[in-house]
């Protein structure tokens, strides 16, 4: 019996183990099936979010307030913009203060020029005038108390400037825990009550500064924070702009003020008290309505000089039509809702039309219901605008062959023709903005040949973030407009699952980022996706709510234009953006990800020889090319061997064209690529363009006596048969007057202007740090080139070090230094170099010595500040000037 039990017991244990394993397997299978069912089954739909309703005036909802009939005093004259630069002076507490950054962000978004200064202490007020012209059109104080408590000398200086030039002041009072609860503002008939909790905000409809702001609505509910300041005054110079009420738990404000009274948190000083107009804020810019009024304040105080008109153009793109996985696409009901909302929006925004971007390959790749939605879109195709993506939604930068890229486009065009989709809008968008910026030349060429594209848009120029820096440009005849995001992406399809919660989306619409995008940009192209119009239809919710909110709170005139007229409108407003500013794609990870892997930033030069002309730059180019670690650009067949990329029409050909002039270095860390274009030095645009594309490049310039340089250029032009140089003496050229022929004045400028050395160097130093700039003594280069080349090699950090004392040899016949060869032979520059000219006449020498005296003095001061040695020729000129 015992033996039998020993046999049966293990068998029962084995069966128990098997049963447990089967139960575990069954549980896992059930969980997997449930997960699959949940993921593939349609979600139980919650009610769709309803857009913001119509505005309703709530002025009667609050109690009495201090809003009184506007006083018609004599207002101070508007800013004399003809006598002031359109620059805003912003006094900040620190470079990192939050309010200061918010002020700057709004100015930058509005494309206004500004200068920030740390709020001065005693006697360090920045210079406010330049001769008889004011430097600033508006003054902003992040901390109003810094203005009020200025020392007497600085305060009088600033106030006198504001009165004389009609300049206004915006100031912010931010209460903190140590602020007095009640106090009079020093020197003003104005009382402040601080650290209050407020509610129920309202706009005073009689405030003179209102332009963008529409005073038709009360904002109910508590205002954020408990650190609000309200203003009180009986003086007629103060007009309330924004008003709120005390929260029930707040103690009453001193004075005869009703409990439910409207209390001013923003006041406008009409200038009756002291002749200076001001707008004072009792809080920062964290509350959205303050941003709106801040823009109005800046516009009013500058006579609308810092204010766009009320027109705002919006275009809503719906990318990825027919693209998307099952369960995220539009169904028939969604298309019907799209049409209904479009019609509603047209009553609010003239000509509003959704702009649909399609990839035909994915037509009918959804569920049966979603395929019916595709058909519904095509049935109503004439009611929308349409633009092409790529046929297979591929990124264009992956196509290196233009014909293959064009074939993909033709497939999409054939699909459009077969289904009656209009193809004449002249607009296209590349998937993921690939190839638009950084430029993929093949994309632009294929777009033009297949579709006749005239305009596109991208969020990547010059960078994705911050969005306020996005700009437009024109390349290869195609207008590239800035594109904006609206917080809706392919994965944001459910209201209650919005990242950060649905309140984040509503906050963006109601005074947040999306609202400010339209407020601060005359033209906004918004990117949305097909999936945003299925499911919870967040695209419809967002834009209907946005439009209604804008019309509640602003006087903006919302409009829609087709892409090509919209592009023309954009560049009419911002003609300065027509020319692009190329940047290094490898300095931005997003740019590198959408840039062809066949391209490399290693082909960009490490240093530039920038001129000026006739100073010895060709000799340096020749000498450097003898170094085994240094490689020059290939010669250009069209611009006298120099590339001349940064200062002429070649710049618009793009960086692919530029990089084709350089080989791929065998070792990017030790090989030095460079180019020499002597016309770069005195160009107004080259330093900015160069620093954008080559921010770490070293810059080499060669300076000789500017009088000798001018004479050399004149003789150079005579040698090349310039009729002006042949028909006029050098003295006639350099002394030409404004009444002389334009051709003569042009030659005069090319002789004289490059010699304004300090002016041009200051421009370079605006964009490059002084440590990246080397100034070579042109006279020493001529007499002792080996010493100059030693300095240049050390500056560039080139290894191995080449001994130019052994490499170079003076050629008596040529009269300058050449490469020494075996057998006593030399290899020299071409016949055009080293020409012998007659000596300059004494009259011209005397004139030029006097003409360049101040320029040379400024150059000496600049070199002293930079810690760079003074060239031998400059010392001689300064000694000669002082002795004369």
Curated annotation (Swiss-Prot):
Primary location recorded for the protein, binned into one broad class: Golgi
TM annotation in the entry: 19-39
Family: Belongs to the sulfotransferase 1 family. NDST subfamily.
The protein's name in its UniProt record: Bifunctional heparan sulfate N-deacetylase/N-sulfotransferase 2
Positions of the UniProt region annotated as Disordered: 49-82
Organism encoding this protein: Bos taurus (Bovine)
Keywords: Disulfide bond, Glycoprotein, Golgi apparatus, Hydrolase, Membrane, Multifunctional enzyme, Signal-anchor, Transferase, Transmembrane, Transmembrane helix
Gene: NDST2
Chain's role: Essential bifunctional enzyme that catalyzes both the N-deacetylation and the N-sulfation of glucosamine (GlcNAc) of the glycosaminoglycan in heparan sulfate. Modifies the GlcNAc-GlcA disaccharide repeating sugar backbone to make N-sulfated heparosan, a prerequisite substrate for later modifications in heparin biosynthesis. Plays a role in determining the extent and pattern of sulfation of heparan sulfate. Required for the exosomal release of SDCBP, CD63 and syndecan.
Single Gene Ontology MF annotation: hydrolase activity
Further details from the record: The presence of 4 different heparan sulfate N-deacetylase/N-sulfotransferase enzymes in mammals, as well as differences in their enzyme activity suggest that some initiate heparan sulfate modification/sulfation reactions, whereas other later on fill in or extend already modified heparan sulfate sequences.
Binding site residues for 3'-phosphoadenylyl sulfate: 614-618, 712, 833-837
């Amino acid at each position: 019996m015992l033996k039998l039990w020993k046999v049966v017991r293990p068998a029962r244990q084995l069966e128990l183990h098997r049963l447990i394993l089967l139960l575990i397997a069954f549980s896992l299978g059930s969980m997997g099936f449930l997960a699959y069912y949940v993921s593939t089954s349609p979600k139980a739909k919650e009610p769709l979010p309803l857009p913001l309703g119509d505005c309703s005036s709530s002025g009667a909802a609050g109690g009495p307030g201090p809003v009184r009939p506007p006083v018609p005093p004599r207002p101070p004259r508007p800013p004399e913009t003809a006598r002031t630069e359109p620059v805003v002076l912003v006094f900040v507490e620190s470079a990192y203060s939050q309010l200061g950054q918010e002020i700057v962000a709004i100015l930058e978004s509005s494309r206004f020029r500004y200068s920030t200064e740390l709020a001065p202490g005693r006697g360090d007020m920045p210079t406010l005038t330049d001769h008889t012209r004011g430097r600033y059109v508006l003054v902003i104080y992040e901390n109003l108390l810094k203005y009020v408590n200025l020392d007497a000398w600085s305060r009088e200086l600033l106030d006198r400037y504001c009165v004389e030039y009609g300049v206004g002041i915006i100031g912010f009072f931010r209460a903190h825990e140590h602020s007095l609860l009640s106090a009079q503002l020093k020197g003003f008939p104005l009382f402040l009550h601080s650290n209050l909790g407020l509610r129920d905000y309202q706009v005073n409809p009689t405030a003179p500064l209102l332009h963008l702001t529409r005073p038709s609505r009360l904002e109910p509910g508590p205002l954020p924070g408990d650190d609000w300041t309200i203003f009180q005054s009986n003086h007629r110079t103060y007009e309330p702009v924004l008003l709120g009420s005390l929260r029930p738990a707040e103690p009453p404000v001193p004075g005869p003020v009703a409990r439910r009274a409207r209390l001013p948190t923003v006041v406008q000083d009409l200038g009756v008290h002291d002749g200076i107009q001001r707008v004072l804020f009792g809080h920062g810019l964290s509350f959205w309505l303050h941003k709106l009024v801040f823009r109005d304040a800046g516009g009013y105080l500058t006579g609308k000089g810092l204010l766009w008109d009320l027109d705002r153009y919006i275009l809503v793109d719906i990318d990825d039509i027919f693209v998307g996985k099952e369960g995220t696409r539009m169904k028939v009901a969604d298309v019907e809702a799209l049409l209904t909302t479009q019609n509603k929006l047209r009553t609010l925004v003239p000509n509003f039309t959704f702009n649909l971007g399609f990839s035909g390959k994915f037509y009918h790749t959804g569920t049966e219901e979603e395929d019916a939605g595709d058909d519904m879109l095509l049935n109503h195709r004439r009611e929308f605008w349409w633009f092409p993506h790529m046929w297979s939604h591929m990124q264009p930068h992956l196509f290196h062959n233009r014909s293959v890229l064009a074939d993909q486009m033709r497939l999409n065009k054939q699909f459009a023709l077969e289904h009656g989709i209009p193809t004449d809008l002249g607009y296209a968008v590349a998937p993921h903005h690939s190839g638009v910026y950084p430029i993929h030349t093949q994309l632009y060429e294929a777009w033009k040949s297949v579709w006749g594209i005239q305009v596109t848009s991208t969020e990547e120029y010059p960078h994705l973030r911050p969005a306020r820096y996005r700009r437009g440009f024109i390349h290869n005849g195609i207008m590239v407009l800035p594109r904006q995001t609206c917080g809706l992406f392919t994965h944001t399809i459910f209201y209650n699952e919005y990242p950060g919660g649905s309140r984040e989306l509503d906050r963006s619409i109601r005074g947040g980022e999306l609202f400010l995008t339209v407020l601060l940009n005359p033209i906004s192209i918004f990117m949305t996706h097909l999936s945003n119009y299925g499911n919870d239809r967040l695209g419809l919710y967002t834009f209907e709510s946005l439009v209604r909110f804008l019309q509640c709170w602003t006087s903006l005139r919302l409009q829609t234009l087709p892409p090509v007229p919209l592009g023309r409108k954009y560049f009419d407003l911002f003609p300065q953006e027509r020319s692009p500013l190329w940047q290094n794609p490898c300095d931005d990870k997003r740019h590198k990800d959408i840039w062809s892997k066949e391209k490399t930033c290693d082909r960009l030069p490490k240093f530039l020889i920038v001129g000026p002309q006739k100073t010895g730059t060709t000799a340096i180019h020749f000498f450097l090319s003898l170094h085994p670690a240094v490689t020059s650009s290939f010669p250009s067949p069209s611009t006298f061997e120099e590339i001349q990329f940064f200062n002429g029409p070649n710049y618009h050909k793009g960086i692919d064209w530029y990089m084709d002039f350089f080989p791929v270095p065998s070792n990017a860390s030790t090989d030095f690529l460079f180019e020499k274009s002597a016309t770069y030095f005195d160009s107004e645009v080259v330093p900015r363009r160069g620093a954008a594309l080559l921010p770490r490049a070293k810059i080499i310039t060669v300076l000789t006596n500017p009088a000798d340089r001018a004479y050399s250029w004149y003789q150079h032009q005579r040698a090349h048969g310039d009729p002006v140089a042949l028909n006029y003496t050098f003295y006639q050229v350099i002394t030409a007057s404004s009444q002389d022929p334009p051709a003569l004045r042009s030659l005069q400028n090319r002789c004289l202007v490059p010699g304004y050395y300090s002016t041009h160097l200051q421009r370079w130093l605006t964009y490059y740090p002084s440590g990246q700039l080397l100034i070579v003594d042109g006279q020493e280069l001529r007499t002792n080139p080996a010493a100059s080349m030693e300095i240049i090699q050390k500056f560039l950090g080139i290894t191995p070090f080449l001994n130019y004392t052994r490499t170079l040899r003076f050629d008596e016949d040529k009269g300058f230094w050449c490469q020494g060869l075996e057998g006593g032979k030399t290899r020299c520059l071409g016949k055009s170099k080293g020409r012998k000219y007659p000596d300059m006449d004494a009259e011209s020498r005397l004139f030029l010595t006097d003409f360049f005296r101040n320029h040379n003095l400024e150059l000496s001061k600049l070199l002293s500040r930079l810690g760079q040695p003074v060239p031998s020729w400059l010392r001689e000129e300064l000694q000669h000037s002082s002795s004369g």
